[in-house]
Amino acid sequence: PRTRRVKRSDGRGNGGTPEEKRPRTAFSGEQLARLKREFAENRYLTERRRQQLSRDLGLNEAQIKIWFQNKRAKIKKASGQKNPLALQLMAQGLYNHSTVPLTKEEEEQ
């Protein structure tokens, strides 16, 4: 796979010493086709299967693991399904990610 190095600031916005950002992996068409085929067979890999794919595709195990995680997350997001526990907590008013502005009293505390 091809990777690229990207410099970024220290995150404080003051242009401090640049640090190395983890490079993004550009998978080849052959690697992607194989990963997609494996994913279609099973959404979760055993350690042994991940090691085999790593050898076959010339990728490290972390790259394969992250690809599978990202693929599962993408499908979950696209399906719009919510976690049953999250739905139950929302029904009870205990799970809400919306924000509301603080009152002056709350800001002063």
From Swiss-Prot:
Is DNA-binding given among the entry's keywords? yes
Which family does the record assign?
A: Belongs to the engrailed homeobox family.
Taxonomy, top ranks, is: Eukaryota, Metazoa, Ecdysozoa, Arthropoda, Hexapoda
Enumerate the residue ranges of region (Disordered).
Answer: 1-31
Return the annotated DNA-binding positions: 20-79
Gene Ontology cellular-component annotations:
nucleus
Q: Output the InterPro entries linked to this UniProt entry.
A: Engrailed_Homeobox_TFs (IPR050720), HD (IPR001356), HD_engrailed (IPR000747), HD_metazoa (IPR020479), Homeobox-engrailed_C-terminal (IPR019549), Homeobox-engrailed_CS (IPR019737), Homeobox_CS (IPR017970), Homeodomain-like_sf (IPR009057)
Where located?
Nucleus
Keyword check for Glycoprotein: no
Specify the species.
Apis mellifera
Q: Which UniProt keywords apply?
A: Developmental protein, DNA-binding, Homeobox, Nucleus
An example of a GO molecular function for this protein is:
RNA polymerase II cis-regulatory region sequence-specific DNA binding
Q: Check the record and name the PROSITE patterns matching this protein.
A: ENGRAILED, HOMEOBOX_1, HOMEOBOX_2
The protein, known as: Homeobox protein E60
One of the GO biological process terms? neuron differentiation
